[in-house]
């Protein structure tokens, strides 16, 4: 669908998320969330607002992400990563980017960040084929 998908599942802290966001110039749909480790999502406010990032928050961190960033970004909330990928697929326009850079642990739905990343890649490929 002329959207580029990036797997940064290893980004389990906010500094890593900010570094990933700063790697791109194109508009970003950011998949953020997972197991809430008490991260300081406020640190994302400035960059999210400046770059007009759309956020799809998922997992146990989704509600806190929403409360912290709702006035800085357009947000979608869901429980599962698969649903977050589906939403991203629907709302991201050609020429834009979907970035999985969760800023949270993976243990709520996956064994580790590697398994989460593999799941992300497989799900994106499944949408591309459909």
For every predicted segment, state its role.
Residues 2-4, 9-130:
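ATP-dependent carboxylate-amine ligase
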